[in-house]
């Protein structure tokens, strides 16, 4: 089972709201997921992003692969650098 960290679209038409979830890669975008680890609201000013860093870090250590967009969010939050440091600077 390949696990991905990706965004799940919520909200109304033309008013998107995304939940960042851990899901099986074979599940549909808005389908079944394992755990919710954050959210992103692109409509609000300023854009709102909340990440549960502890949960995300645990899933990344277990081998979950983030989508490209989620990877950019994690990089801006400093989680990818933290994971890299822990993995290679033992």
UniProtKB/Swiss-Prot annotation:
Entries under InterPro entries matching the protein: Ribosomal_bS16 (IPR000307), Ribosomal_bS16_dom_sf (IPR023803)
UniProt keyword terms in alphabetical order: Ribonucleoprotein, Ribosomal protein
GO CC terms, sorted: cytoplasm; small ribosomal subunit
Intrachain S-S bonds: none
Alphabetized GO MF terms: structural constituent of ribosome
GO terms of biological process kind: translation
One Pfam family this sequence matches: Ribosomal_S16
Keyword Ribosomal protein in annotation: yes
Similarity field: Belongs to the bacterial ribosomal protein bS16 family.
Name of the protein this chain belongs to: Small ribosomal subunit protein bS16
Gene of this entry: rpsP
């Amino acid at each position: 089972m390949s696990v991905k960290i990706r965004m799940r679209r919520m909200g109304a038409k033309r008013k998107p709201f995304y939940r960042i979830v851990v899901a099986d890669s074979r599940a549909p975008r808005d389908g079944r997921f394992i755990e919710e680890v954050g959210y992103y609201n692109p409509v609000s000013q300023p854009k709102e992003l909340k990440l549960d860093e502890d949960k995300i870090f645990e899933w990344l250590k277990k081998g979950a692969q983030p989508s490209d967009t989620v990877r950019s969010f994690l990089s801006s939050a400093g989680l990818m650098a933290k994971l890299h440091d822990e993995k290679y600077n033992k």
